[in-house]
Structures are given as C-alpha cells and as structure tokens.
C-alpha cells in the first residue's frame, strides 16, 4: 500500500548508503513519495546524487543546503517552492560534534565545541522548520532523529547527548507552534546503527553488543525499521501524533 502517493518530502542528511537518512528515503520511496534531497558541501554532493539516481522512477531534486548558513537555507526552500510548490514533510537527519568533544569527560567540553554541536544538531531543526513552514501549505510532518543519549547518560556521547536533549525539547516547542498550521513535529529515537556519525562514538562495538544481549528483542536496529516508522509518522495514519519521541531501538530504552 502506497501510503504517501502524491506527496513530496525533503530528506536532509544523507551521507552514504549506511545513513539513517538513506533508510528513510528508501522507505518513503517505497511508499510512493516524491523526494527532494539536500546536501552540505560539494564533498557529499556526488554521493547524494548517485544514491538518488538508484531510486527507480524518481527524478529527485538535489539541492545544496548548509543549515549553518541562513542565506543558503532560505535559498534552498525558495528553490523548492519554485520547482515543486508544496511539500508535505521534512526528514531532518543532521547532527555533528567535534570528535574530541566525544572523548573523555563532558565537563571538559570546549565552549566552541558545545556551541557547534548545538548549532548543527539542535538549532538547525528550528531553522529548517521556519523555512519549511512556508512551503508546507497543506500541513504535514517534520521529523528529526535523536538517540537515547539525549535522555540519559551514555558513555562517550557527551556533548552530543546534551545537543540531542535540546533537540528533543525543540520538537515539543515546535509542535506547539506549528500545530495551528496543521504541521506535526516528531522525533525518532533510533537504536545504534553503523553510520558515518557512529564512527565518532568511542567503543561503539560494545554498545551494539549490549543491545544484542539486553534489549527485549535481542537485536540491533536496522535502517529499514527506522525508515518504516518514518513512513507511519509522515502518513495520515499518524495524523493525531505530534510532539512525540518514538523509540525504535528493540525496546532497549525501557531497561533500568
């Protein structure tokens, strides 16, 4: 069943085929959606274009969008308005922190490192939502990705955990602001997946092993599981869901 037939979504944050953003894109494509991709910097452009070309039947718009640059962000959504008109949602899959700030103790986080992580990983959702609102004239859903480290202390997550906590709070406030426009805002808290970002988290293999040994489902999370949950949140099946943080982590978050 093509739950998203005739709808258009922007997917932000694809880096390579292991990206959670790419898993979301594939699931949206399989559900009948039309996709627009953004990339940050020329280094990622080729990857994004090559991946977009693998989606059969899609002629995806691929646009530059550095979320730390207000002018480029505005220009991106203005181009979307000119080329497409209306969109029905955004998958915000963007986060970054300096690797050095993911080591050692959080108390030693640098001021610049803290602000960088907050700017890219948390504030960017608000900046994106402000621009997306202008082209989401039929309502829809804005989705972001978070992790358990935003709710509790996870070793080696440090400054990113604090940024994710900020992101999760932003989801609630944005949901309150944008609900009157028919726009829902939600987050998926995905379990650990081997992505480019995960390489920066120390002892990542140990985290995966613990999930496999202790999570109720006794397995790690897949791109497809996150992507299919995104389809639900973007579809009318979730029309009454906003301000939520849905865990897709084999149940690991319920453990004490």
Curated annotation (Swiss-Prot):
Pathway: Lipid metabolism; fatty acid biosynthesis. The active site is at residues 147, 157. CDD domains: ENR_SDR. One of its GO terms (molecular function) is enoyl-[acyl-carrier-protein] reductase (NADH) activity. Keywords: Fatty acid biosynthesis, Fatty acid metabolism, Lipid biosynthesis, Lipid metabolism, NAD, NADP, Nucleotide-binding, Oxidoreductase. Belongs to the short-chain dehydrogenases/reductases (SDR) family. FabI subfamily. Homotetramer. This is Enoyl-[acyl-carrier-protein] reductase [NADH] FabI. It comes from Bacillus cereus (strain ATCC 14579 / DSM 31 / CCUG 7414 / JCM 2152 / NBRC 15305 / NCIMB 9373 / NCTC 2599 / NRRL B-3711).
């Amino acid at each position: 069943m093509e739950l998203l037939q005739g709808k258009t979504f922007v997917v932000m944050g694809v880096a390579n085929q292991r990206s959670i953003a790419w898993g979301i894109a594939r699931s949206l494509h399989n559900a009948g959606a039309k996709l627009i991709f953004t990339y940050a910097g020329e280094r990622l452009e080729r990857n994004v274009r090559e991946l977009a070309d693998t989606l059969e039947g899609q002629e995806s718009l691929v646009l530059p969008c550095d979320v730390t640059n207000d002018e480029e962000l505005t220009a991106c959504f203005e181009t979307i308005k000119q080329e497409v008109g209306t969109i029905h949602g955004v998958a915000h899959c963007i986060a970054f922190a300096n690797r050095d700030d993911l080591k050692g103790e959080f108390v030693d986080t640098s001021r610049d490192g803290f602000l960088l992580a907050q700017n890219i990983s948390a504030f960017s959702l608000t900046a994106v939502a402000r621009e997306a609102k202008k082209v989401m004239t039929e309502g829809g859903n804005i989705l972001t990705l978070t992790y358990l480290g935003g709710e509790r202390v996870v070793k080696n997550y440090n400054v990113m955990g604090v940024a994710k906590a900020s992101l999760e709070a932003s989801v609630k406030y944005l949901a309150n602001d944008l609900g009157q426009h028919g726009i829902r805002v939600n987050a998926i808290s995905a379990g650990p997946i081997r992505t480019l970002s995960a390489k920066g988290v120390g002892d990542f293999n140990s985290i995966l092993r613990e999930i496999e040994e202790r999570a109720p489902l006794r397995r790690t999370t897949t791109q497809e599981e996150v992507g299919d949950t995104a389809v639900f949140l973007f579809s009318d099946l979730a029309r009454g869901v906003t301000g939520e943080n849905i865990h897709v982590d084999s149940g690991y978050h319920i453990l004490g």
